[in-house]
Amino acid sequence: MDNRPILILAAAHDTTNIVYNAISKNFAVEKVILEGRESKKKFIMRRIRRLGLLTVTGQVLFQFTIGKLLPKFSQKRILQIIRENNLDLTPITGEKIMPVDSVNDERVLSIIKEIDPSLIIVNGTRIISKKILKNIPCKIINTHAGITPKYRGVHGGYWALVNRDPQHNGVTVHYVNAGI
């Protein structure tokens, strides 16, 4: 068995704490590289270039309406799921965290090469660039809310329920590669 540690690439979120706490009970997690938040303006401009103005306008309207209401209406259910599944929200200790601006920074590659992990777990980061992916020497898995590829994006589970397609509401865990 490979005794090298696991590395987590993630965004600062409760789900990152849950993933870290669950994994670290049974496996050695060396570090959690936490990606900083991208400015909203930069994020929107990048999406417009990639997806077009009309699509992004719809996404922004969704975020400012339903996206703002979802957490308020779902908080009771979220707490119930956390309790029923004994999910551990304990914050990750400071010495485990390495903050970076982006998972696509050159510094991230240096950290990965130094740690030499057996596996990288991704949770909630922006899309990892092909340049970074081709230089990572181990398997990478990603957790994604929603059943991909049918429901992509941050609110995949929501859209499955809106479309009365509950069999596609869930979480996808998949290997990461350069093809999206």
Positions of PLM-derived features:
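One-carbon transfer enzymes
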Residues: 1-180
